[in-house]
């Protein structure tokens, strides 16, 4: 279509005629279509869901911005999901689209160990130890890439000390706000187990919550 850029908007001039019923209802018409190669991968947050989500990473293929709002997503001409675009996507800008849940990948997070220790002679400190396992099972017949995200507690109180023992640096990325991120490649029908291990130390007379 021909595009007319305004100060804060765009106008599209649709070639040819379009029949729109006179029924006081909104109707959609095709403005433009384009094909673009997308990179498919998976992502999961085991603390929130046991499912992996498929997503497509690509660049905006149109010579005009994709505006914020609701977007319907089709894969191989089949409707798969509705998502919300929260910001304007400029031409050739990177974008990520969720294509829904893939039942061929199962993820489970479970608590393996939790025990309490005490240290000190006169003013004892409490130390709680946690160990979690995240099991990822792929039944796909091809190699896939998947991003796994979880978290561990972060202390903003100088009396509370949190030590992350696993994963080690180099095995995963960690952020200052307690996010752990793994970028994995899984072979066909592979099962992988990730470990999270941390300890929390604090004075015995201090009560804390929200560790799990």
Feature annotation, model-predicted:
Residues 1-133, 140-161, 166-167, 174, ...:
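Intrinsically disordered, low-complexity Ser/Thr/Pro/Gly-rich interaction regions
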């Amino acid at each position: 279509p021909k595009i007319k850029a305004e100060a804060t908007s765009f106008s599209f001039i649709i070639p040819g005629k379009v029949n729109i019923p006179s029924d006081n209802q909104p109707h959609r018409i095709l403005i433009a279509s384009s094909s673009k190669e997308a990179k498919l991968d998976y992502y999961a947050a085991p603390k929130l869901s046991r499912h992996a989500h498929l997503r497509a990473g690509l660049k905006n293929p149109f010579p005009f911005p994709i505006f914020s709002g609701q977007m319907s997503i089709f894969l191989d001409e089949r409707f798969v999901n509705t998502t919300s675009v929260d910001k304007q996507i400029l031409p050739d800008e990177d974008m990520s689209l969720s294509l829904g849940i893939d039942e061929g990948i199962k993820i489970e997070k479970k608590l393996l160990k939790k025990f309490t220790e005490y240290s000190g002679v006169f003013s004892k400190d409490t130390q709680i130890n946690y160990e979690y396992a995240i099991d990822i099972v792929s039944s796909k017949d091809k190699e896939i890439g998947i991003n796994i995200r979880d978290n561990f507690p972060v202390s903003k109180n100088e009396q509370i000390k949190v030590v992350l023992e696993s994963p080690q640096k180099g095995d995963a990325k960690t952020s200052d706000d307690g996010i752990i991120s793994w970028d994995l490649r899984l072979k066909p029908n592979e099962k992988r187990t990730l470990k999270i291990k941390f300890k929390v130390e604090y004075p015995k007379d201090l009560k804390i919550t929200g560790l799990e």
